Amino acid sequence: MACDFDITKENIYDYIIEDTPGADEAIKALSGICSQRADSQWIIAHGELPDNRQLNISSLGYFTIPKLYGLMEGDADISALDEIGALRVLGQDNLQADGSNVLIGYVDTGIDYLNDVFKDRLGNTRIQAIWDQTDKTGTDVANTYAHFGRVYEKDEIDRAIEADNNGENPYSYVAQRDTSGHGTLMASISAGSYTDGYVGVAPGAELLVVKLKQSKQYLRDFFLIKDDVPAFEESDIMLALRFLEDYAIRLGKPLIIIFGLGSAN
């Protein structure tokens, strides 16, 4: 059953169901439950939390509860680019190994799309699309991939960059921001353009970005995660991966995924 309510609300729980024979029919038979497919094997379902906001593991099964992922933290050392031979490879034009005609997808905290390291030589964005899962504007016409958030496509991002160049507010066109900086760091290391003496591993690649929304409070409570610690739901990550795959198929280009999150589960 398609979702016709806001599945990002705190009183809506999410769970992951393996698509075994009869699973889809069983979900459709339940009232107040909607679902969307993560891939050919897994279904993400959504329903209203009980009044006590407690998860009944015995009836749901532990594996159906989305696990939480955090940011992989560490000092960024760009000297590693030389140590792995990336800069030497880029210096050999005959290899054509700069990532051209390849998509790199990011599932993280978003991206600073105004940064010059994500623009081509003409000043246009190299980002093909950004799915901002946190966006609640409700005006998205491009997001046919999931039932929440907003997808900003290349022409919109270029329009925002042009506005910024003209002294206007770019975020009135593309509201997405990377307030953490983690996603921007991951993208700049792996795909930064030649800028002020810096270059990433694949400066010719195009980018697809998913800004994950923060996990719901009931899952933080269940896994004893502090409120000030970034935490992201497994179900949102699965949908993000589907978005990247679907968009890459739409563009007809190979896809590499950078995933800078981790979990103790």
Could you say what each language-model-derived stretch is?
Residues 1-103, 110-126:
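Autoinhibitory propeptides
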Residues 10, 18, 25, 48, ...:
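Glutamate identity and glutamate-enriched acidic tracts
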Residues 49, 73-78, 134-140, 239-243:
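Short C-terminal domain-edge/linker segments immediately following a structured domain
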Residues 91-235, 252-256:
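Subtilisin-like serine protease catalytic core
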Residues 190-194, 240-245:
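Short, well-ordered amphipathic alpha-helices
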Residues 241-265:
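Short acidic, glycine-rich surface-loop motifs adjacent to enzyme active sites
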